[in-house]
């Protein structure tokens, strides 16, 4: 009997006491959760930890009193499986269900609401019976914008609550699949943030940072979080390909957070990261380089414990980081971000040649010719031998003239159309003033009348 049928059958009335029956599915085999399948589901797949599940349910006390039903609200109930959002019995039972399945679940108090109950409808130490129908389940969306680009399904839960942070050393075993074809199978030990150098998609690294030690998960990646519009020749992955990875996070060692490092460590790590960023940049891995330079900024931006000698090094590192960030943003065509990075650099050194020039390039890229020209002119004022600035200034002026010419032509065409429309309107008005044949026959009388009127007015 389905949940809908049960609702019709009971017709709002209190049922007879419900019997305790079913297969014991409690982890301890203590008969705390008993399950009876009323209708088999389809397929072989069941929901995994972290999946969002959608169900209809009705709940009764053992005396047959109904205390709750999603059917009465005509709205499916959803929750994240295995996250403690519902009573223990539900997390246990729904994990065993297939889509379309209907089952009865009997839950002892320790797997339901315990000695506290849930006043006013559920008394203390109550054994409950539920009928649950599973409609669908889907993996956990790990993307910030919830665009479905990184979906995780947890096969095996990990230990504890700690997760790898940026820069953590992780040990993983992974398998990559494209259309069920195994294209990558490796055991790796690497630093989070350097996955691209190992031909790992950025989305996979993001997923690893959400895993716990010992966790085994399936990760589904949309193209923008995988190998994008380029694909990966090494693995024979075409452009715009969706991928699936099986990942086992064996172990990890978290990187020190900024607040855990002293000033000497921050300087030392900043120099190491700067060199790493330079290597990535030269290899054309601009996103990876970007991550390295951002680390330096986060470590040094608001640090106040440096000595006078250290502050000179800090100033130089911060300036270089903002300039390098600007260059990465330019390469990635993120022009607003490039301008922001240049502004940060120019706050540290208002006459910096690279800061002014790169900001001018960003302004030019978005057709903000006045601001671009001002930046290039200042570069030439301070550094007259800068040939690149002279070239870009000429380009800026040329494009300004082209834009003015286009605007002039646009306005000329606009005025020409307006003039034509005005002339057409006048012509139509004039044509409408001509008398008809009928009016012409009565013209003498009209003229006489007009003359009389003129005399009267005179």
Curated annotation (Swiss-Prot):
Q: What does this protein do?
A: Immunophilin protein with PPIase and co-chaperone activities. Component of unligated steroid receptors heterocomplexes through interaction with heat-shock protein 90 (HSP90). Plays a role in the intracellular trafficking of heterooligomeric forms of steroid hormone receptors between cytoplasm and nuclear compartments. May have a protective role against oxidative stress in mitochondria. Also acts as a regulator of microtubule dynamics by inhibiting MAPT/TAU ability to promote microtubule assembly. The PPIase activity controls neuronal growth cones via regulation of TRPC1 channel opening.
The family database entries (SMART domains) matched by this protein are listed as:
TPR
Q: Is this entry keyworded Transferase?
A: no
* Polar residues bias locations: 447-458
The record's subcellular location field reads: Cytoplasm, Cytosol; Mitochondrion; Nucleus; Cytoplasm, Cytoskeleton
Keyword field: Acetylation, Cell projection, Chaperone, Cytoplasm, Cytoskeleton, Isomerase, Isopeptide bond, Methylation, Microtubule, Mitochondrion, Nucleus, Phosphoprotein, Repeat, Rotamase, TPR repeat, Ubl conjugation
Designated name of the protein: Peptidyl-prolyl cis-trans isomerase FKBP4
Question: Which residues are recorded as modified (N-acetylmethionine)?
Answer: 1
Instruction: Give the GO biological process terms.
Output: androgen receptor signaling pathway; chaperone-mediated protein folding; copper ion transport; embryo implantation; male sex differentiation; negative regulation of microtubule polymerization; negative regulation of microtubule polymerization or depolymerization; negative regulation of neuron projection development
- The PTM N6-acetyllysine maps to 282
Location of Phosphothreonine modifications: 143, 436
EC number(s) from the headed UniProt entry: 5.2.1.8
Record note on quaternary structure: Homodimer. Interacts with GLMN. Associates with HSP90AA1 and HSP70 in steroid hormone receptor complexes. Also interacts with peroxisomal phytanoyl-CoA alpha-hydroxylase (PHYH). Interacts with NR3C1 and dynein. Interacts with HSF1 in the HSP90 complex. Associates with tubulin. Interacts with MAPT/TAU. Interacts (via TPR domain) with S100A1, S100A2 and S100A6; the interaction is Ca(2+) dependent. Interaction with S100A1 and S100A2 (but not with S100A6) leads to inhibition of FKBP4-HSP90 interaction. Interacts with dynein; causes partially NR3C1 transport to the nucleus.
Which intervals of the chain are annotated as region Interaction with tubulin?
267-400
- PPIase FKBP-type domain: residues covered: 50-138, 167-253
Q: Which residues carry this modification: Phosphotyrosine?
A: 220
Give the position(s) of the covalent cross-link described as Glycyl lysine isopeptide (Lys-Gly) (interchain with G-Cter in SUMO1): 441
Looking at the Swiss-Prot or TrEMBL record, what is one Pfam family this protein matches? Answer: FKBP_C
| Activity regulation details | Inhibited by FK506.
Q: Which residues carry this modification: N-acetylthreonine?
A: 2
Citing just one GO molecular function, the answer is: copper-dependent protein binding
Species the sequence originates in: Rattus norvegicus (Rat)
Hey, what tissues is this thing expressed in? Widely detected in the brain (at protein level).
